[in-house]
């Protein structure tokens, strides 16, 4: 990068500049999400040859279970008695849960109790359906969830149906099953029917995001795209600059020295000018990450050509 000059001791072909972006200071803070906005740079960068992510501070404020993820509801149908059945969609509050609290929350919704531990609605058949998890407080067990009847109505319950092909209104739709609450519970099939007791196929995983993508659209289609997906259903944006593994507990700040970032410099096929950036965070399904009105910051290292 450095060559001897005739007048100055050293002439350099490339100038490196660091651009700090903190979403707290974006102009459109009241009308845009921190995970999807466009910024007009105060300085125009001319003859840019590369861009690279060099620092990131990301608060872990996004939820594993939420309406925006489409996994905050559970459809159940129970057949009981000689010829009776009941079906209902149950809504789980948005939030982050550990496995045991996740199962407790669902059970409390199925069977609400009063301050004395008595059923509020003993006449409702769902009060006798329970999820359980084979996991102790110190982490021992299989981590798998089961569902079945309990209590005085156990013998009258004939069949339980779990249907993850239905939306929050109880209607069948075509959303991928991997985006439903069934996958968080470890139930990987679209539907479970014909029995009154089921064991999950996989372990419970209420934490929804294992990684996120940082996308930077510089409005130049003149660079390499280092991220390639080998699966048809995996969505990758052409402007992905980094893949960020999520580590640590929720509601903490994730710093670049505490995370695993996969990132390659964006190399342009020829010098470009940059004055506008669209910044987005995607979850692993390719959806805009819902940050719950919190902000993040990062640093871009931009290399530009210098006229000698």
Can you describe what each PLM-predicted range is?
Residues 1-308:
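The ATP-binding site of the protein kinase catalytic domain
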């Amino acid at each position: 990068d450095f060559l001897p000059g005739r007048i100055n001791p050293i002439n350099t072909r490339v100038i490196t500049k660091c651009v700090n972006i903190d979403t707290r200071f974006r102009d459109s803070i009241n009308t845009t999400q921190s995970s999807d906005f466009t910024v007009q740079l105060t300085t125009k960068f001319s003859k840019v040859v590369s861009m690279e992510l060099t620092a990131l501070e990301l608060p872990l404020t996004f939820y594993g279970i939420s309406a925006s993820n489409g996994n905050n509801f559970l459809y159940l149908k129970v057949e009981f008695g000689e010829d009776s059945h009941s079906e209902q969609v149950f809504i789980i509050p948005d939030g982050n849960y550990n496995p045991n609290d996740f199962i407790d929350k669902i059970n409390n919704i199925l069977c609400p109790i009063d301050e004395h531990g008595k059923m509020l609605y003993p006449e409702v058949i769902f009060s006798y359906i329970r999820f359980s998890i084979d996991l102790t407080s110190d982490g021992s067990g299989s981590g798998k969830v089961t569902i079945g009847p309990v209590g005085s109505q156990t013998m009258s319950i004939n069949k339980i149906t779990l249907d993850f092909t239905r939306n929050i209104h109880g209607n069948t739709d075509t959303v991928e099953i991997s985006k439903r609450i069934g996958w968080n519970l470890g139930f990987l099939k679209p539907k479970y029917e014909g029995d009154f007791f089921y064991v999950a196929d996989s372990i419970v995983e209420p934490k929804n995001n294992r990684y996120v993508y940082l996308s930077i659209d510089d409005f130049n289609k003149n660079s390499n795209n280092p991220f390639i997906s080998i699966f048809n259903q995996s969505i990758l944006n052409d402007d992905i600059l980094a893949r960020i593994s999520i580590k640590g507990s929720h509601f903490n700040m994730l710093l670049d020295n505490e995370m695993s970032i996969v990132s390659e410099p964006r190399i342009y096929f020829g010098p470009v000018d940059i004055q506008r950036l669209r910044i987005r965070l995607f979850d692993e399904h390719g959806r805009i990450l819902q940050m719950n009105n919190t902000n993040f910051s990062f640093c871009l290292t931009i290399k530009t050509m210098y006229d000698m």
